[in-house]
UniProtKB/Swiss-Prot annotation:
This is Cytochrome c biogenesis protein CcsA. InterPro entries: Cyt_c_assembly, Cyt_c_biogenesis_CcsA, Cyt_c_biogenesis_CcsA/CcmC. May interact with ccs1. It is found in: Cellular thylakoid membrane. The keyword Membrane applies. It is a multi-pass membrane protein. GO terms for biological process: cytochrome complex assembly. It comes from Prochlorococcus marinus (strain AS9601). It comes from the Bacteria. The chain crosses the membrane at residues 18-38, 48-68, 73-93, 102-122, 148-168, 216-236, 250-267, 279-299. Keywords: Cytochrome c-type biogenesis, Membrane, Thylakoid, Transmembrane, Transmembrane helix.
Length: 309
């Protein structure tokens, strides 16, 4: 009977059912990831569930796309799931570079909270798909909004990795040798082997996480830059103005300046250690305000609507 109802709902309400499945799989994944931290060993089960979550969100968004007829990122419900899709993808890519149990243990709670907010906090009318106004029926919707959302995901991953660096070193001095260019470190080889005159520097756990944080933020910054440029071009085509300084545009520009300052200090000043990690961690709040803050105001072209009311 339960299975019959499940499959019946899956047929008639696939978006909602898949959204709930994502929530429950993340809920299962959370204690497993925390247990892996205490065991100090990466968990293949966590990675498999994360892959499943990513695939379920992909399927959910494809269903919504098929039902609505437009790219599924036009309201807050869709964008929250798209953001979660981006964070899970970023988590898997980071783990591919460096497997450490702390990586999923910091990413999964954010993914779970994001999905829980979409499932249980958003009013029902903000979950429904609606027809787009003529100005939004453009290929720029896919280019601009998806790139900006992926930039948020990458910046959030970078901030969370910096938080993990601070957490690991909370009771001791933080010394980082990781490369600010994100390409690793090398030194001259003492043995001068025939085929190679350099050998890699072995980075510590914190240094690996710091480098991955830097790389994630760099990717997020590039994507945010592309998102701002594409948004300006789209705005000029649709409304005849490149920039209108509405709340979302203003905060997006503030976010861009924030991360530009971080990258400038890392690259030109060789800034290492606790200070850049603190700054990158603070970036999480900047992205949060940029993404959700405008919806508490309920104004501007970029607002998805008033959340509580």
């Amino acid at each position: 009977m339960i299975l019959d109802n499940f499959f019946k709902n899956l047929i008639y309400e696939p978006v909602s059912v898949l959204g709930l499945l994502v929530f429950y799989f993340l809920l299962i994944n959370l204690p497993i990831s925390l247990g892996a931290v205490f065991k100090k060993k990466s968990s293949s089960a966590v990675r498999l569930i994360t892959i499943l979550v990513n695939l379920l969100i992909t399927l959910q968004l494809l269903f919504r796309w098929s039902i609505s007829g437009h790219f599924p990122i036009s309201n807050l419900y869709e964008s929250l799931y798209f953001l979660t899709w981006g964070i899970t993808l970023g988590q898997l890519l980071v783990e591919r570079e460096y497997q450490a149990p702390i990586i999923p243990s910091i990413a999964i709670p954010i993914e779970l909270l994001t999905v829980a907010f979409a499932c249980f906090v958003l009013p029902e009318d903000l979950k429904l798909s609606s027809n787009l106004v003529p100005a939004l029926r453009s290929s720029w919707l896919v280019m601009h909004v998806s790139v900006v959302m992926l930039s948020y995901a990458a910046l959030i991953i970078g901030s969370l990795l910096s938080m993990s660096v601070l957490f690991i070193n909370k009771n001791k001095p933080l010394q980082i040798r990781s490369s600010s260019t994100g390409i690793g470190g090398f030194k001259l080889s003492n043995s001068y082997p025939v085929n190679d005159l350099v050998e890699p520097i072995e980075f510590s756990h914190s240094e690996e996480l710091d480098t991955l944080s830097y790389r994630s933020i760099l990717v997020g910054f590039v994507l945010l830059t592309l998102g701002l440029i594409s948004g300006a071009v789209w705005a000029n085509e649709a409304w005849g103005t490149w920039w209108s300084w509405d709340p979302k545009e203003t905060w997006a520009f503030i976010s861009w300046l924030f991360y530009a300052a971080y990258l400038h200090m890392r690259i030109s000043k060789g800034w290492q250690g606790r200070k850049p990690a603190l700054l990158a961690s603070t970036g999480f709040l900047v992205v949060l305000v940029c993404y959700l803050g405008v919806n508490f105001l309920g104004i501007g072209l970029h607002s998805y609507g008033w959340i509580f009311g």
